């Protein structure tokens, strides 16, 4: 569903993690992630399916990251790892075991939504 507006909802906590999530539909958009952007809005995120490690080189701002496991039949995914406020330029996650993708988020998004490891999240159309 690349290009379609999405939101990331924490079904365990009943919270919205990010209301405007873009899906990286190509290798290049996953490779670039949020590099080169001057900032990220508080309600924004980037879903990168298939990505299990990230780096912060060339990033201009810190981010939160939620690493998600495989999609269940109902479309939900378990949170397998979290990184809060990864600093620009120096943060790195080599591998998040069990991850099948990662969502890059504005710093503080995970705390605001009370998201924890083991929670179930769903990417769904933003119009819901």
Predicted regions and their residues:
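Compact, glycine-rich, soluble single-domain proteins
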Residues: 1-128
């Amino acid at each position: 569903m690349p290009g379609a507006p999405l939101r990331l909802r924490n079904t365990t906590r009943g919270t919205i993690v990010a209301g405007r999530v873009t899906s990286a539909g190509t290798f290049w958009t996953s490779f670039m992630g949020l590099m080169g952007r001057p900032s990220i809005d508080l309600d924004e995120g980037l879903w990168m399916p298939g990505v299990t490690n990230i780096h912060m080189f060339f990033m201009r701002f810190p981010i939160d990251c939620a690493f998600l496991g495989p999609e269940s039949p109902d479309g939900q995914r378990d949170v397998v790892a979290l990184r809060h406020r990864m600093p620009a330029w120096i943060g790195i996650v080599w591998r998040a075991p069990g991850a099948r993708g990662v969502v890059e988020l504005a710093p503080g998004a995970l705390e605001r939504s009370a998201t924890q490891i083991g929670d179930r999240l769903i990417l769904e159309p933003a119009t819901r």
